[in-house]
A protein has these predicted regions:
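Peripheral, non-catalytic segments of secretory and membrane proteins
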Residues: 16, 188, 365-366
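Acidic, histidine-bearing metal-coordination/catalytic regions of metal-dependent phosphoesterases
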Residues: 2-144, 148-151, 162-163
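N-terminal short leaders/motifs
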Residues: 58-69, 210-227, 274, 304-309
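Conserved beta-sheet core of the metallophosphoesterase superfamily
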Residues: 217, 243-255, 259-262, 267-367
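Core catalytic region of metal-dependent phosphoesterases/phosphodiesterases
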Residues: 107-108, 113-126, 134, 139-254
Length: 367
């Protein structure tokens, strides 16, 4: 049992509630619940197993479910009851939402903003949780680097962009490198190079997009956050989306779009903005789908823009009255990309639109 788990467990046994303990220790209520639960599981473990685990530095019962304990005269096999993985994951996500406090943002920085302008901050293919070895790929990458990169890149974009009244942050799919603890792509089952545990990477992704949203809120009057599905995080993206929606549930300046489906579409004056990860359809079909599904917006606009990611390199084309732009990824190359001679560079952008004139400004931050 870790000292943190023992501390939370002892306070709980003395009659303190989990929320009270969380306030006292300065932690989320979900963190305290998890520590108490792990402590209880440890105390229910056979003492011999506790001792064996302690000897090899595995005090956290959540790490080890079974194994062999070798003694002088025999080898003993033990097996701990294993939680249902699906139920345990859902419980953890639910607890995280419950313990996540709503945020009181500091006041927006003083200064006028232009109601005729809107700025888009796309975050394509960040692959938080990916691990790259610099000697193999040319550049190191892990969870901490990914979060720092998003904070730095978006921060520079916000600082250099016009003071538009509105802003949209679009996590354009593959925000997370892995969808779960299997460390494989959901559809193709390709084995992934993953840094740390999925639980930690999920928390890091929530933190990174929250940091981006709150930096943008210091400049813009209204910030919309969009978290889209990717082929790497087919369902994990929803945990990020719902966590952020809960975080800003009482905030009037940050709105997290919570809609089912894979497409984001927004009208701003004569501008039509759309995005999708880009793994399921080519540009021509995306444009036809846009016109067919949102004919009112199509007919009411003159400047139309479609963002995709997925392939990690830059490509822009005009298709049937729409500027379709495939964006460079935020992530570094992994071993697969390096071995296949992919050489695209990482990049952040901030694109500003005038409600009547279309795109009027673009900031690029190369990594």
């Amino acid at each position: 049992m870790t000292p943190e788990q023992r501390e939370a467990y002892d306070l709980h046994k003395k009659g303190m509630g989990k929320r009270e303990i969380a306030r006292m220790l300065g932690k989320n209520e979900s963190t305290i619940r998890d520590r108490i639960r792990r402590a209880e599981r440890y105390l229910q473990t056979d003492p011999a197993v506790q001792g064996a685990m302690s000897e090899v530095g595995m005090q956290d019962i959540g790490v080890l479910h079974s194994g062999w304990v070798k003694t002088d005269g025999a080898s003993l096999y033990f097996q701990q009851p294993k939680d249902n993985d699906t139920t345990d994951t859902l419980d953890r996500i639910k607890e995280y939402f419950t313990g996540l406090p709503a945020i009181d943002l500091p006041p927006k920085q003083t200064g006028p903003s232009d109601a005729d302008l809107l700025t888009v901050y796309p975050i394509p293919d960040a692959h938080i949780g990916m691990r790259a070895w610099a000697k193999e790929t040319g550049e190191a990458y892990d969870t901490d680097i990914a979060v720092d990169r998003i904070q730095s890149g978006i921060g520079q974009c916000v600082q250099s962009s016009p003071a538009s009244s509105e802003a949209i942050i679009i996590a354009l799919g593959d925000l997370l490198h892995a969808n779960d603890n299997t460390n494989m792509t959901p559809a193709s089952k390709h084995v992934l190079d993953v840094d740390s545990r999925h639980y930690r990477n999920l928390e890091a992704a929530i933190y990174a997009i929250a940091a981006a949203a709150e930096m943008a809120a210091q400049k813009h009057d209204k910030v919309t956050v969009v978290v889209q599905r990717g082929n790497h995080d087919e369902s994990a993206y929803m945990a990020v989306m719902f966590a952020l929606a809960e975080r800003y549930r009482e905030d009037s300046r940050i709105n997290v779009q919570k809609r089912p489906g894979e497409f984001f579409v927004h009208q701003f004056g004569l501008c039509l903005l759309a995005s999708q990860h880009g793994d399921k359809a080519k540009a021509e079909r995306l444009v036809m789908h846009l016109a067919d599904e949102w004919p009112e917006m199509w007919g009411a606009t003159r400047h139309r823009y479609y963002f995709t990611g997925h392939l990690h390199h830059s490509k822009m084309q005009d298709v049937g009255g729409v500027q379709v732009e495939q964006l460079r990824a935020v992530t570094a190359r992994d071993a697969y990309a390096a071995s296949n001679a992919y050489s695209a560079r990482a990049q952040f952008q901030a694109i500003t639109y005038h409600r009547n004139l279309g795109e009027v400004s673009r900031v690029k931050v190369n990594i």
